[in-house]
């Protein structure tokens, strides 16, 4: 079987679709670094081309609804390697049939893309619920997260709508970037740090350094922990339900769990 290797970007995958039609091939798609199948022929290395990718996406816009395109975009934010082949197959089928196949739940590739999208949207909702801000002495609010999926672009509008009169930074410690908002700016700015070792907060638990943390915020954190413990009814503790509603992987950045 022919094998394509691409750079794990959406433009790279769309370029692979372009190449597969240009070369009349139905390849197995692998990300850079994945192991080649046994006895595989020399792989075709996809050179990401923005122009080719744009042509493929424009073609998708002619065949798919806006909602179907949104599902593709959101599913890609999962960053799951297992999605690469189903998404590649799905896009190829759209061009081969010339139809919108996005509602064909009996197609395994369509189903894989839709289910992946659901997982990403589920985590988007959890991020909105579980983000905890800390206030720095300069008045800026900081929240550190480390989601399984790359959901930061999906939640930024939510926080801009609610905190458009305050300065804040939401930082993804896993992907090493964040969004900073400072009124009266129209929109948050994506930022990265050249030296993460020098940032005034912990990437492990998200806590601001003591010399940066606002004095009143430390008080509010202590009050919140006290309240969290006080409302607990020991006879009704249900660890299984708590873990289902609030997975352990989010705890390290949550004030009430630190």
Residue ranges and their predicted role:
Residues 1-51:
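N-terminal ordered "arm"
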Residues 167, 179, 194-258:
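Long, compositionally biased intrinsically disordered terminal regions
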Residues 70-75, 173, 236-243:
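Short coil/turn segments at secondary-structure boundaries
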Residues 12-23, 89-96, 157, 161, ...:
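Short, hydrophobic/amphipathic alpha-helical patches that form generic packing surfaces
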């Amino acid at each position: 079987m022919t094998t394509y290797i691409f750079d794990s970007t959406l433009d790279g995958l769309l370029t692979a679709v372009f190449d597969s039609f240009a070369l009349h091939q139905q390849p197995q798609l692998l990300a850079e670094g994945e192991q080649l199948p046994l006895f595989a022929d020399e792989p075709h290395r996809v050179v990401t081309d923005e122009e080719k990718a744009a042509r493929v996406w424009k073609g998708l816009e002619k065949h798919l609804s806006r909602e179907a395109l949104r599902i593709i975009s959101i599913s890609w934010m999962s960053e799951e390697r297992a999605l690469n082949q189903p998404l590649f197959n799905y896009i190829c089928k759209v061009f081969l049939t010339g139809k919108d196949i996005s509602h064909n739940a009996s197609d395994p590739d369509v189903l894989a893309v839709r289910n992946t999208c659901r997982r990403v949207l589920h985590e988007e909702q959890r991020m909105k619920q579980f983000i905890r801000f800390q206030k720095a002495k300069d008045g800026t609010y900081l929240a550190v997260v480390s989601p399984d999926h790359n959901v930061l672009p999906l939640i930024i509008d939510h926080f801009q709508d609610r905190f458009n009169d305050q300065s804040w930074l939401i930082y993804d410690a896993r992907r090493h970037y964040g969004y900073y908002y400072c009124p009266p700016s129209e929109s948050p700015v994506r930022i990265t740090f050249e030296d993460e070792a020098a940032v005034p907060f912990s990437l492990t638990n998200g806590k601001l350094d003591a010399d940066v943390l606002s004095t009143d915020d430390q008080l509010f954190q202590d009050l919140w922990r006290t309240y969290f413990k006080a409302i607990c009814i020991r006879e009704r503790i249900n660890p299984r339900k708590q873990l289902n509603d609030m997975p352990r992987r989010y705890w390290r950045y949550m004030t009430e769990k630190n």
